[in-house]
Amino acid sequence: MHIFITGIAGFLGANIADYYLKKKFKVSGCDNLVGGSLDNVDKKVNFFKVSCEDLNKMSQILKGVDVVLHAAAYAHEGLSNFSPVSFANNNVVGSVSVFTAAIKNKVKRIVYCSSMARYGNIK
């Protein structure tokens, strides 16, 4: 089974990759390295430095993938007030590009990952 993880250099993506590598899955992934670090990516991962917003590249690299785990997003909720267009492009347009490329390539399953950061601060 070939798993592709977006945001693979971030905390969530890197830990998901480690889990599937231990189960002997083929793991590929992408990250724009804005919030993640290449140091988090295991050497066994086929890594692509690409933004999820790039539909053409996403369509190319998702060929032959069975499952997409979409964990890429800007999670700096406080900063989104200062740069809403950047956040919308990365999080919304990026997600639409990933889903479109996955559908185009007949990926069997898409899993959308989230984190507690989406809920903001506890009041």
Predicted features, each with a name:
Residues M1-K123:
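N-terminal Rossmann-like NAD(P)+-binding domain of SDR-like oxidoreductases, especially those catalyzing
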